[in-house]
Structures are given as C-alpha cells and as structure tokens.
A protein has these predicted regions:
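A short beta-loop-alpha structural element at the N-terminal edge
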Residues: 21-35
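Conserved GNAT-fold acetyl-CoA-binding loop/helix
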Residues: 41-61
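A short helix-loop-beta-strand connector motif used in the catalytic cores of GNAT acetyltransferases and
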Residues: 61-74, 91-92
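Conserved beta-strand in the GNAT
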Residues: 74, 80-90
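Conserved acyl-donor/pantetheine-binding loop and adjacent beta-alpha core of acyl/acetyltransferases
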Residues: 86-120
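Conserved active-site alpha-helix within GNAT-family acetyltransferase domains
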Residues: 126, 146-163, 171
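Conserved GNAT acetyl-CoA-binding A-motif
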Residues: 135-146
Length: 182
C-alpha cells in the first residue's frame, strides 16, 4: 500500500497490528508529553544511559518551540498519546561537522529528534520510521553512546552509522543516516 504524505496532518498506520496514528502535537498535549519524557528519562537511566536528557531536558520551552514550529508529532493508540518525536525538515547545524566518519550523501535531509515513548505500546520506532521514510529520502538521527536500546532500534530500521557529531551542548552523539539512494 502506497500512501502520499505530502499534505498531511494525520497518519494512520494500518499495516501495523497495533493500529497507531500520528498527528501534529498540540499545546494541549504538553502535560502528557512531559509525562512521556519523564518515563523515557527513567527508562534510559535503568538501561545504562543516565547521561542523556539530564537536568530536565527537554524542557517545556523546548517542546513548545517544537510545537510552534510544526515539527512535533504524537503517536496515538486508542486515542491515547503513547509517544512523541520531532521530525524537522532541512539542515541541522549540529550535523554540519561529523567526526570519525562521513554522511552517506550531502542531499537534503530531515532529522528525527527527541523520540520518546510511554512504554505502553510496542512498535513505536517502526511506525515513526515508516512515517518519516514515506516523506523523506534522507533521514538523519543521533543518540548517546550509552543508549544501546536506541542504537539497536536505529540500526534495525536500515540506518547506517556515519560518525560522531557534537550537539548544541557540546556533548558527543553517535550519528546515523537512512538514504533511499544508498
């Protein structure tokens, strides 16, 4: 089944047994998004990644900026928000310089940031990646070296490890890229 996402605000993944939907985040979603980020921070700490998303990151201000820019999305199952992520089109300045490797290509790309789940539903990463891949030929994503769960999920979705980038705080992140035109 081929779906055109060129003019979307809503996406229903009918291929997944879990029957999830994706839509733009709204300001009214903020309390639930903050709960989800709390759960994600706890999960990361419990699975050996206590250094990512510290000191209250992402803050309400960051999330509100993402919502205002139209980059923030939620994943719903049975009308309940179970995950969130940012899908941003265009160049990301933190990806301008890559160390110990190189990007697969220099074509236009989208970036996925701040993917987080409530832990209530499986298949979130696959649903998010299918959504992004339907819209973009090149997608970049990064994560902390200690985030072994995310690293595994990223590779499972046909991303290639490209090298190391430095995020706005100066912290190093492992960087990956998916390209339909390898």
């Amino acid at each position: 089944m081929s779906i055109d996402f060129s003019n979307f605000a809503y996406y229903k993944n009918e291929d997944m047994e879990t029957n999830m939907t994706i839509r733009h985040s709204k300001t009214s979603d903020l309390p639930r998004l903050m709960e989800i980020f709390d759960v994600a921070r706890s999960f990361m700490a419990e699975t050996g990644n206590p250094k990512q998303w510290v000191d209250g990151y992402p803050s309400e201000e960051v999330i509100m900026e993402d919502i205002g820019n139209g980059d923030s999305y939620v994943v719903e199952k049975d009308d309940k928000v179970v995950a969130t992520f940012v899908l941003r089109e265009g160049d990301d300045p933190t990806y301008d310089i890559i160390y110990n490797g190189e990007w697969l290509n220099s074509e236009p790309y989208a970036t996925i940031h701040r993917i987080a789940t409530s832990g209530e539903t499986k298949g979130i990463m696959h649903t998010v990646m299918q959504f992004a891949k339907q819209r973009h030929d090149n997608i970049r994503i990064d994560t902390h070296e200690d985030n072994k769960v995310m690293r595994h999920l990223i590779m499972k979705e046909d991303f290639k490890y490209c090298g190391v980038i430095r995020c706005w705080s100066g912290a190093e992140r492992l960087a990956y890229q998916f390209s339909k035109h390898k």
